[in-house]
């Protein structure tokens, strides 16, 4: 179970460093981190949206 501090850190990371937010949430460097890096290189907003999806909506 995530604490309030973890949720706040994830929100901040989702906005400023989306790939790091996914790594923080999953605790591993997997394909989701790579996909988010590609999204961030193409345009920042898709990277943010993908990070929010992985961190908060995907179980």
Curated annotation (Swiss-Prot):
Record's subcellular location: Membrane
Gene Ontology BP annotations: innate immune response
GO cellular component: membrane
Transmembrane segments: 5-25, 37-57
Protein keywords: Membrane, Transmembrane, Transmembrane helix
Topology term for the membrane: Multi-pass membrane protein
Pfam families noted in UniProt: Pmp3
Disulfide-bonded cysteines: none
PANTHER family for this protein: HYDROPHOBIC PROTEIN RCI2 LOW TEMPERATURE AND SALT RESPONSIVE PROTEIN LTI6 -RELATED (PTHR21659), UPF0057 MEMBRANE PROTEIN C04G6.5-RELATED (PTHR21659:SF16)
Family: Belongs to the UPF0057 (PMP3) family.
Name of the protein in question: UPF0057 membrane protein txt-9
Gene expressing this chain: txt-9
């Amino acid at each position: 179970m995530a604490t309030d501090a973890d949720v706040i850190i994830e929100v901040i990371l989702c906005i400023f460093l989306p790939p790091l937010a996914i790594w923080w949430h999953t605790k591993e460097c997997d394909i989701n981190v790579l996909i988010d890096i590609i999204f961030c290189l193409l345009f920042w907003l898709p990277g943010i949206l993908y990070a929010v999806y992985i961190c908060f909506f995907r179980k």
